[in-house]
């Protein structure tokens, strides 16, 4: 609380409003950073949007999302910790707070925070001629001002609300704690609607703010009432009566910068509330840490003073540094609210630069947080894109991507995979590159040299594919085709095109998903030219949406145009930063192109979801190429035993330990480690026999220049005689399963040449 010796308002009392200067109306010129209003510390301010027609094509309107159902829980002992973000983030539980402890002992506004509510210029400051006046008339515009509380403890407002005192001061004056005498002394908060100097504005504000009473969401502070009370001059002053939310604001909670995972967890709880507002045609407009309260059970949006109807005009309230730059031109939109979410996340986690008391637009290029969490960086970039059409289209879409980013962040921080199902991509359809490192040992079996090259066709057949857009008119008939064979899919689409299927009167010519499914089937069949033509025709009709860009990148990969494929997969990733599919595609493309980028993308996918087996084997290959063979073995050891590729991973790790190294680089420990991995697998497993031969043969070569203990490996003494017996036995076992007579003879001859000389 504030002490009499320090009249500056504390952060602890900023729960309902910003602790900065008062809310200020501003003209269009006030958006310039050199204007007087923006030279003040950050606080909720107003900009004026005139009523004019904006024809630049910027998308506006409501986005319907589902509201959360309120859940009533039985009384129970609460854990000192609670979880956010789908259980991925744990935070301390905020204890319940006695409302009276929030009262300010000395409700005084510091001189540095006194500004005229009308023109935004400093008022009430000390001068050489005398002390500062807490009320008077602005010397610049003549408007009356007062920084004294208009309500005193004991006042009864509307014959119902007993004022207990001030708890904060914000843009529209003092915020008061009161007890509702009609409802068992329930604590409530009273806040002025507009400045009290304009009676006509008071009446208009009372009428305009009535719509807030219709807002009902568990993540938004409740509006109980709208009342009037005469000030000392006899003028009616309107107040909004709100639920008292005890707890801590995010501004108080953060202190230093928050961990990224914690900040994302908070935003995931707030986004459904924003989505609800958008669904009923409202914009919040003033999201910032000060306006988010952490209570014992949940997070809540407080301070609805800036809420307005979507696309409205007139005075629009917001905070410079958080407010979208285009709001004067477009009015409040879903996109302007999304911008504030991005800026709030940035303020919570990054060291943002400030100028003249407000955050500078954009993101710091050298912040280590952005270097550590690439997907988080991409998400912030999209959320605050200067072009509102490129931002997330809804709170629901941003929430989905934010959850994906959270899984990556938590996996990075803890080293524990955090897999989850995507809402826009299918799971991987199969695997690629799993057998590459062990394939060359197949020469023992059939005498044929096997390629270790990854192919684009193999990758494309395995990559996830975009899920069908459920809003598309052709979606119902495509649900069953998602995992169909390409030829079958083309037959279905051909039948639909010729009316052989019942489409219930729907004009399938309007569908985007039907031709897109045809493109996918053609690419799976390798008909890149035809798929590309159809894709370009579709793009000419509907534009390059992200699903189209994905398949364009796939076609470029198949055409070996890896630079273009990388560019377009990156475009998809920038649009959907929480998805693993574009990261897996970028890793595979980089491996095909022979660049070094595959390691970081394979690593991100594998560390987040160890069910994406292709990423694990890809990461191991990349680590081997980089000379990090021990790391590659560790990666292969992370393949879960429940995977059908577990045996291949064990065999590949054995090969990785020994291959690609000179005899001088191999140690006895490498050989014994490889032998233990093979020995743990039954001989009936494919490739076990040939890897046994490889391990024993490598040990025999190594022993020619080195010495080792004679302890057995794979059942044979670690001696020249013992290893020769082992190699001979392995070669004869392989000869018995050789597919051709000639290779069988070759293996027998090789076994005879290795066989130790008999002594009698």
UniProtKB/Swiss-Prot annotation:
Residues at the catalytic site: 286 (proton acceptor)
Q: Which GO terms describe its molecular function?
A: ATP binding; protein serine kinase activity; protein serine/threonine kinase activity
- Keywords assigned: ATP-binding, Kinase, Nucleotide-binding, Serine/threonine-protein kinase, Transferase
* Database matches in Gene3D superfamilies: Phosphorylase Kinase, domain 1, Tetratricopeptide repeat domain, Transferase(Phosphotransferase) domain 1
Give the catalytic activity: L-seryl-[protein] + ATP = O-phospho-L-seryl-[protein] + ADP + H(+); L-threonyl-[protein] + ATP = O-phospho-L-threonyl-[protein] + ADP + H(+)
| PROSITE patterns recorded | PROTEIN_KINASE_DOM, PROTEIN_KINASE_ST
Please report the stretch or stretches of sequence annotated as the Protein kinase domain. 161-403
Residues binding ATP? 167-175, 191
Going by the record, the broad EC class of this enzyme is transferase
Q: Where is this region: Disordered?
A: 1-31
Q: Which domain of life is it from?
A: Bacteria
EC no. given is: 2.7.11.1
What does the record's miscellaneous section state? When artificially expressed from expression vectors, encodes an active kinase, which is able to block the lysosomal delivery of mycobacteria inside macrophages. However, while PknG transcripts are found in M.smegmatis, expression of PknG is blocked on a translational level in this non-pathogenic species. This lack of efficient translation is caused by regulatory elements in the upstream region of the gene.
* Self-association state and partner proteins as the record states: Interacts with GarA in vitro.
Member of which family?
A: Belongs to the protein kinase superfamily. Ser/Thr protein kinase family.
Report what the protein is called. Answer: Serine/threonine-protein kinase PknG
Q: Tell me the organism's taxonomic lineage.
A: Bacteria, Bacillati, Actinomycetota, Actinomycetes, Mycobacteriales
């Amino acid at each position: 609380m504030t002490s009499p010796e320090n009249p500056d308002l504390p952060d602890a009392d900023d729960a309902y409003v910003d602790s900065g200067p008062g809310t200020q109306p501003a003209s269009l010129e006030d958006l310039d950073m050199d204007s007087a209003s923006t030279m003040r510390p950050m606080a909720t301010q107003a900009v004026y949007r005139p009523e004019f027609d904006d024809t630049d094509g910027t998308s506006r309107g409501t986005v319907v999302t589902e509201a959360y159902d309120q859940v009533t829980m039985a009384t129970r002992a609460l854990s000192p910790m609670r979880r956010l973000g789908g259980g991925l983030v744990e935070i301390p539980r905020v204890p319940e707070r006695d409302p009276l402890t929030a009262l300010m002992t000395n409700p005084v506004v510091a001189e540095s925070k006194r500004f005229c509510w009308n023109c935004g210029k400093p008022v009430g400051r000390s001068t050489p001629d005398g002390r500062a006046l807490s009320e008077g008339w602005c010397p610049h515009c003549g408007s009356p001002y007062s920084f004294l509380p208009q309500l005193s403890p004991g006042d009864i407002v509307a014959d119902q609300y007993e004022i207990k005192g001030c708890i904060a001061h914000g843009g529209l004056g003092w915020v008061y704690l009161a007890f509702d005498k009609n409802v068992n002394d329930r604590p409530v908060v009273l806040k002025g609607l507009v400045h009290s100097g304009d009676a006509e504005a008071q009446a208009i504000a009372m009428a305009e703010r009535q719509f807030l009473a219709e807002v009902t969401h568990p993540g938004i502070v409740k509006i109980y009432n709208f009342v009037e009370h005469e000030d000392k001059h006899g003028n009616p002053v309107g107040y909004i009566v709100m639920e008292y939310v005890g707890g801590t604001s995010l501004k108080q909670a953060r202190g230093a910068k928050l961990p990224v995972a914690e900040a994302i967890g908070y935003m995931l709880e707030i986004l459904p509330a924003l989505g609800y507002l958008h669904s009923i045609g409202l914009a919040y407009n003033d999201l910032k840490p000060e306006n988010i309260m952490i209570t014992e059970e949940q997070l809540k949006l407080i301070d609805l003073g800036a809420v307005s109807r979507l696309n409205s005009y007139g005075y629009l309230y917001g905070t410079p540094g958080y407010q979208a730059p285009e709001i004067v031109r477009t009015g409040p939109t879903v996109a302007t609210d999304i911008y504030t979410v991005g800026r709030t996340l940035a303020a919570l986690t990054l060291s943002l630069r400030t100028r003249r008391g407000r955050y500078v637009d954009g993101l710091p290029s050298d912040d280590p947080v952005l270097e550590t969490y690439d997907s988080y960086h991409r998400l912030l970039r999209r959320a605050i894109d200067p072009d509102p059409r490129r931002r997330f289209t809804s709170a629901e879409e941003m929430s989905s991507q934010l959850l994906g980013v959270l899984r990556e962040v938590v996996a990075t921080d803890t080293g524990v995979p955090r897999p989850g199902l995507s809402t826009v991509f299918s799971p991987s359809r199969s695997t690629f590159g799993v057998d590459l490192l062990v394939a060359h040992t197949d020469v023992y079996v059939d005498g044929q040299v096997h390629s270790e090259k990854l192919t684009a066709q193999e990758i494309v057949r395995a990559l996830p594919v975009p899920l069908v857009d459920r809003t598309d008119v052709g979606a119902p008939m495509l649900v069953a085709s998602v995992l169909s064979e390409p030829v079958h899919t083309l037959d279905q689409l051909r039948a639909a095109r010729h009316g052989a299927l019942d489409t219930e009167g729907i004009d399938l010519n309007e569908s985007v998903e039907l031709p897109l499914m045809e493109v996918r089937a053609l690419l799976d069949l390798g008909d890149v030219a035809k798929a590309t033509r159809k894709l370009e025709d579709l793009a000419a009709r509907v534009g390059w949406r992200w699903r189209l860009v994905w398949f364009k990148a796939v076609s470029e990969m198949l055409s070996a145009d890896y630079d273009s494929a990388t560019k377009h997969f990156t475009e998809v990733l920038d649009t959907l930063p929480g998805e693993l599919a574009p990261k897996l595609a970028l890793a595979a493309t980089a491996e095909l192109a022979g660049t070094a980028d595959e390691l970081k993308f394979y690593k991100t996918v594998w560390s987040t979801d160890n069910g994406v087996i292709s990423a694990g084997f890809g990461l191991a290959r990349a680590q081997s190429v980089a000379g990090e063979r021990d790391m590659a073995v560790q990666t292969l050891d992370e393949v879960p035993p429940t995977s059908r590729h577990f045996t291949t991973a064990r065999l590949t790790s054995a090969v990785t330990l020994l291959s690609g190294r000179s005899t001088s680089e191999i140690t006895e420990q490498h050989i014994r480690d490889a032998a233990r991995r093979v020995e743990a697998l039954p001989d009936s497993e494919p490739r076990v026999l040939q890897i046994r031969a490889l391990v024993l043969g490598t040990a025999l070569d190594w022993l020619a220049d080195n010495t080792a203990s004679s302890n057995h490996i794979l059942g044979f003494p670690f001696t020249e005689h013992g290893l020769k017996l082992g190699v001979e036995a392995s070669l004869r076992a392989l000869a018995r399963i050789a597919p051709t007579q000639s290779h069988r003879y070759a293996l027998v001859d090789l076994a005879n040449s290795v066989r130790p000389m008999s002594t009698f």
